[in-house]
Curated annotation (Swiss-Prot):
Organismal lineage: Eukaryota, Metazoa, Chordata, Craniata, Vertebrata
Chain ranges passing through the membrane: none
TPR repeats: 57-90, 101-138, 139-172, 176-209, 210-243, 245-280, 281-314, 320-347, 348-381, 382-415, 416-449, 450-483, 484-517
Organism: Homo sapiens
Cysteines engaged in disulfide bonds, as pairs: none
Stored InterPro entries: TPR-like_helical_dom_sf, TPR_rpt, Ycf3
Record keywords: Repeat, TPR repeat
Name of the protein described by the UniProt record: Tetratricopeptide repeat protein 6
Keyword Repeat found: yes
Length: 520
């Protein structure tokens, strides 16, 4: 096939060099040959010499396309507008409609080529909308309009157009790009479930695209579907065994499993990435957190330090080392590292982390200032509200604490720690119905968490429902058998019920456990 193409190409070049051969051709044929041979100036000269009439607008469209190839975008815009004006005054018919749609499409491309950003894209949208009104099955017009909407940040309009493209008889390449582009918009909007479906469809079209598998895996990770994330990261690695981001992504997904075997499997992935590229910072930082999770704080500190030495501007490495320093009891070093991170990038997360360090150092006033600054910087950052609420609780400002816990839940509705703290606070404030609902929600999501049963027992105790309190304390002890606090409180509850012997036995058990703990 290529031999025939090369022969045809050679023949066209030969004709272009023969005046006699060209003179026997029509002006349109001559222009096409000159344009094919990339002699755009000559092609434009031929077409400029033609006196057009309304029935020959194809000439006008051809001239504009040649000018576009010659990078004469402004001239192309003028010609296209001239053609559209002529068509608007001619008898309408299928040919005129097709030429008009083609002119409008190319006019949109010209606007995009000119690069006048907002105005360019808005003008392109106007012209593409006109093209769509003339041919509602033009998937290319819808697709290009979606691209323009994306450029001017009209993301919902872009999503609508991409949806229409997929309903039309688009080519496979356009469908692939549509799924990709729409998926990226969903990621930007934080709608990872929708993005996931688009990336999956794209992966079905392009099965050997490792980046698509990686994007799909990342969406699974974002919506806490960690096993599915591992599967897609593995697929990406089968396509490309040296895909570093896939090793790190799979390792981070394994870390979310929450058991030792998965943590060790994650370590293998991080080490594999570092074996391929020892200077790969993402893998180094993730490996540091992996070692921290295993309680190997000094080794974790070493790897965060290597990351900092490799890239002194990497604020995530400073943050990781600050966390490890805090766990090792070196509060001053932790403060130095988090301040170093904030000099590079001040985020709500870093401010909140610094607030935690202030709390460890006993500086609650400074901690509260950092939490408030974090909220100012990012009013949707749940953890800052939660930590500030805990300080209010500590100072017995329970109404403020409850308000801050509610704000934290607004932005992180499934956080069981915030729910339980609000339940405890509402119990103190005697908002019993709200407290009851919060405790029920926590137990539904965390049925094997001993602490929630212990705290709900306090709630029942306040309501003088001692039998229900005893049931919850029994459940707490079944989950955490040697807790002196629970035995001590159950003794108090049983005393209220009148179970004196059982209460005395619980008091004695609590004392024995406390004595044992003091000896250890």
């Amino acid at each position: 096939m290529m031999k025939y193409y090369d022969l045809a190409k050679f023949t066209i070049y030969q004709i272009a060099e023969m005046d006699k051969g060209l003179s026997e051709l029509s002006p349109m044929q001559q222009a096409l040959i000159y344009s094919f041979c990339e002699n755009h100036d000559k092609a434009i000269e031929v077409l400029d010499g033609i006196s057009w009439n309304r029935a020959e607008m194809t000439m006008c469209a051809l001239l504009a396309k040649v000018q576009m190839k010659a990078k004469r975008t402004k001239e192309a815009v003028e010609v296209l507008k001239k053609a559209l004006d002529a068509i608007s005054h001619s008898d309408k018919g299928p040919d005129a409609t097709a030429i008009s749609a083609d002119c409008l499409y190319n006019l949109g491309l010209c606007y995009m080529e000119e690069g006048n950003l907002q105005m360019t894209y808005k003008l392109a949208i106007t012209d593409l909308t006109t093209a769509i009104s003339m041919d509602k099955n033009s998937y290319t017009a819808f697709y290009n309009r979606a691209l323009c909407y994306t450029k001017i940040r009209e993301l919902q309009m872009a999503l609508t157009d991409y949806g229409i493209v997929l309903l039309l008889d688009a080519t496979e390449t356009v469908k692939l790009n549509t799924f990709l582009n729409r998926g990226l918009i969903y990621v930007e909007l934080g709608q990872y479930g929708f993005a996931l479906e688009d990336f999956k469809q794209a992966a079905l079209i392009s099965r050997t695209n490792g980046s698509l598998c990686h994007a799909t895996a990342m969406c699974h990770h974002r919506i806490n579907e960690f096993e599915e994330a591992v599967n897609f990261f593995t697929w990406a690695l089968k396509i490309n065994p040296c895909f570093l981001d896939a090793y790190v992504g799979r390792g981070n997904s394994y870390m979310e499993y929450g058991h030792d075997e998965a943590t060790k499997q994650a370590q293998k992935d991080f080490l594999k990435a570092l074996h391929i590229n020892p200077a790969y910072i993402k893998a180094r930082i993730s490996f540091g957190y992996n070692l921290q999770a295993q309680g190997k704080f000094q080794k974790a500190w070493n790897h965060f330090t290597i990351a900092i030495d490799t890239d002194p501007k990497n604020y995530l490495a400073y943050e990781g080392r600050a966390v490890v320093c805090l766990q090792m009891g070196n509060n001053f070093a932790a403060m130095q590292d988090i301040n170093a991170a904030m000099k590079i990038s001040t985020t709500a997360e870093f401010l909140t982390n610094r607030g935690v360090i202030h709390e460890f150092m006993g500086h609650k006033q400074n901690a509260m200032k950092d939490y408030q600054d974090a909220i100012t910087l990012n009013p949707k950052y749940s953890l800052a509200y939660f930590n500030a609420g805990n300080i209010y609780f500590h100072h017995r400002q329970f109404s403020q604490a409850s308000d801050y816990f509610s704000k934290a839940l607004k932005f992180d509705p499934e956080n069981e720690y915030v729910l339980m703290n609000r339940a405890i606070t509402n119990t103190i404030l005697k908002k019993y119905e709200e407290a009851k609902e919060d405790f029920a929600n926590v137990i539904e999501s965390c049925p094997f968490w001993a602490a929630v049963y212990f705290n709900r027992a306090h709630f029942y105790y306040c309501l003088k429902q001692y039998e229900l309190a005893e049931e919850d304390l029994n459940k707490a002890l079944s989950l955490k058998p040697n807790d002196a606090l629970v035995y001590n409180f159950r003794a108090k509850v049983r005393g209220k019920i009148g179970l004196i012997e059982e209460a005395m036995a619980d008091y004695n058990q609590a004392l024995d456990l406390e004595d044992y703990a003091s000896v250890i």
